[in-house]
Amino acid sequence: MALTDEQIERYSRHIILKEVGAKGQKKLLNAKVLIIGAGGLGAPAAMYLAAAGVGTIGIADAEEVDLSNLQRQIIHQTADVGKAKVQSAKETINAMNPDVTVNTYREFITSDNIMDIIKDYDFVIDGTDNFPAKFLINDACVMAKKPFSHAGIIRFKGQLMTYVPGEGPCYRCVFKNPPPKDAVPTCKQAGVIGAMGGVIGSLQAMEAIKYILGVGDLLTGHLLTYDAITQEFHKIKLPSDTEGCAVCGKHPTITELIDYEQVVCEDH
């Protein structure tokens, strides 16, 4: 289907790019991206994907908007406090871009529902704030052969990596297992600078856009870290040997999804 005159104007700064053009914009409009977590990472990622014209955006989050969220979760407004995050996010996106269909999942992801939720999406963004959820997302995406972007933020630091089936290590290749409960402070205990979510969440959106367009180099096989205090990015090459991984290796020992105990941070 041809782009409308309004779409040509709306996405004109995309279309003029040789890496995008009208063909690439149509790819974006036909794409489906799932964001798990409508918080500090998921909020900016969702807004930039919506602005870019990603045609279907899924948002999964069981929580309600809290006043303390507004310091960084820019998709929500003061009037949204007490509202379901998925509903608040949907309303913001609908007001921003009528080209975008928003699917909402007001539920915690578990081993029982995640495969059904992710099955229809082209790319998954992990915007969660706890290790059990991150390992569950990783394992589900590996088993379902879904590309995804992992990210995490705390204090003045952030990190992200991208997994594409068959093109490098997964999250479990690098981090093996969740740390013991209480071994790592929650975001409520440690704090996080608000703009950190904007920096890292926007990079997650960029990874999704590049994957959809098929342009550039993704963060497969690399972990990108950012320190806002020193204003330094570091791109760390990850081990390329994935054969021994418990989930994506040649002889996986994890063949069923695991529900580790989740400690939900109201400030993610």
Question: Which residues make up each language-model segment?
Answer:
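Adenine nucleotide-associated cytosolic modules
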Residues: 1-268
